[in-house]
Amino acid sequence: VETADIQFSVPRSDRVTIYKPQPRAPITFVCWKWHQPGYRTPYTAEHVNVWAAMIKRYYKKPHRLLCITDNPTGIDCETFPLWKDLDTARNPSGAHLPSCYRRLKIFSPLVTSELDIGEGDEVFSMDLDIVICTNIEMLIQKYADESFVGWKGVGTHNPVVYNGSLFKFRAGHVNFLWDEFNFKTSPHEAIKAKYFGSDQGWLSYRLRGTAPGWTAGTDGVLSYTSNLHAARMRSRAHLPSNARIICFNGKRKPWEKEVQQNSPWITTHWRL
């Protein structure tokens, strides 16, 4: 029996494309959005989207944007469900004040692993009520090898405190900030030592000034309330030349019309 040579061809639609796995982003920017009953300021998906737009505008290296939230509706960047741990914990300095103890779990290596953040990768946590004014690469490079960097200031009763509005850490390197926290005892220990606030009180108490930090004068990380409020400025229409990030860690927020009218530079940067 004679057989003819038969040539088979694979139709284009049946061809298999092999995709190479994408490398992890070297840094993950994290923001937080959840509803806290009784707190004065509601945070929205728009605030998250503006935050993400500012990061994209002022950080051009590879990165990942992540919002940890109890309500992802309307958020354009990647989201992750907020855990229930410490969801009923209140700020020991006052129930009307923000309570951010829930954020401490981000220091757990189990959580960063679940977030697909590799051990040693950088995580930069930011509050939503900030305005990024220029390139922030310097802030990240300055302490690139450190396990933890915070927004550093001088406390009323202690020489060094860290504000929870901004902090950067390497995943898996500061597990103790979560592992050693006990809500029944830790907040009272921090307050007894005159470190106030919720998560920032614990961070300041536990670190005791041993970690480096960004400052207003050296790094341009400023407080709108303390450094830039119109009443304190010769010209409310201009930013200091060294301003990189303005934190609205107080009652005034950058999306409020009155605040924008008093400081018109806000809308130049706080936008989609």
Can you annotate each of these PLM segments?
Residues 3-92, 114, 171, 271:
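N-terminal anchoring/stem segment of glycosyltransferases
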Residues 22-23, 159-161, 237-241:
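Extracellular/periplasmic catalytic domains that process cell-envelope and extracellular macromolecules
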Residues 34-37, 71-74, 84-88, 130-132, ...:
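Short, solvent-exposed loop/turn segments at secondary-structure junctions
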Residues 36-46, 92-97, 190-194, 258-260:
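Short, flexible/disordered intra-domain loops and linkers
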Residues 61-70, 124-126, 130, 148-150, ...:
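Short, hydrophobic beta-strand segments that form beta-sheet elements in well-ordered domains
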Residues 73, 81, 85, 99-161, ...:
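GT-A fold catalytic core of metal-dependent nucleotide-sugar glycosyltransferases
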Residues 86-90, 95-102, 198:
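A short, glycine-/small-residue-rich helix N-cap motif at loop->alpha-helix starts
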Residues 171, 175-272:
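Catalytic core and acceptor-binding pocket of nucleotide-sugar-dependent glycosyltransferases
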